[in-house]
Amino acid sequence: MASPAPLVASISHQMVALQTLQLLQQEWGWGDGPVAPGNPRDPDHVSTAPARRSGPPRARPGPGREERGGGVGTRSRRTAARANSPEEEVVRGAEGGAELLPFPRDRGPCTLAQMAMRSALARVVDSTSELVSVEQTLLGPLQQERSFPIHLKDSVEFRNICSHLALQIEGQQFDRDLNAAHQCLKTIVKKLIQSLANFPSDAHMVACASLRQILQNLPDI
């Protein structure tokens, strides 16, 4: 039985990249945060809810310190004020990923360039999610039966590109990083198709068809 270790490691790097991009979408108000692989979100959906923040639990009032005048509402308003403060606008990325920079939200309607950037980012996120799903459900069992080449360095590069992308704010460098992530993801998919091409079994053909569908969703930008 062939070892699935290279594929597992490759998926791990892709998952970190995916979570980093999903958190980037969430921080910019372009998505709902991390979702399970294989469940792409609507790229046109824009979340207006603030990102959830974690913090230490508040102590309950002790005897003689009972809050008055609608204490729950008061606490909620104070919590909302903290969540919307500028100091809370930096969000940690996925474990091992990058720290996301704050994105200025109150900028009015999106320009055409911003809409195109949002669409391109959503396409990379959804395609990465689909790729991880195909690798886990189809390629994993095939790799255990018969080994085929896995190019781990491409997934490592993809993760690094996405981590660098998360450090950028709009501009030419962001566009270059997004295009690099797009092209690197296409390279990963193409090499997987090539690795499976020499195995004519039905299961390999199904996996190749799924990978080709991902390629169709990644046109050149």
From Swiss-Prot:
It comes from Homo sapiens (Human). Residues 31-92 are annotated as: Disordered. Pfam families: DLEU7. PANTHER family: LEUKEMIA-ASSOCIATED PROTEIN 7. Ubiquitous. The lineage of its organism: Eukaryota, Metazoa, Chordata, Craniata, Vertebrata. The gene is DLEU7. This is Leukemia-associated protein 7.
